[in-house]
Amino acid sequence: MIRVLHITGSMNRGGIETFIMNIYRNMDREKVQFDFLLWTDKKCDYTDEILRLGSKIYNISPRRKGIINNIKELINFFSKHKEYRIVHQHVNSLSYITPLKIAKKNNVPIRIIHGHNIQVGGHPLNQYLHRFNKLSIRKIATDFFACSELAAKWLYPTKQYLAGDYKIIKNAIDIDSFTYSETVRNKIRNELNIQDKLVIGHIGRVSYQK
């Protein structure tokens, strides 16, 4: 069996996390298994399901509690867990690719970077780190994924983007969960007392991408 180590901040009900889970639930887990390295010290929304499906979850200190401890724990993790031959880091920017850098130093042969966004948010330092790491990402990762052409163009160096040295991985969704049901429609409208009203709903962040 192949075990792939997915690296991300948490496994709550965000876009990246739900994308991973949609794939995980529907793949052949007798051939490939996902494990998770998370920089959080809290139980996540998907924790119980992940463990039930046969995964291992490893937790390291969040960066907000000290980047030094975060790096030390990453070094310790990869020095102990030599069994992983594939690591797959999910990112919104290149501001934090330390896990991939340390994986490379520990000779992990397949190191995937997977972009899920088209801009850097938060502190201006993140913008600087994104631009800085963009200069070396081709030396750090071995495989380059993005959720769209725009994400690839923004995430990877111009020369790499123009050469087409990346793969577009479209976000998978479980379409059965969104199939129209008259029964469900009427049930929810009755519960919310909105039988004869036009309802427009939005469950995402009110941001440019949405």
Language-model features: where?
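Membrane-interface segments of envelope glycosyltransferases acting on lipid-linked substrates or membrane lipids
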Residues: 1-210
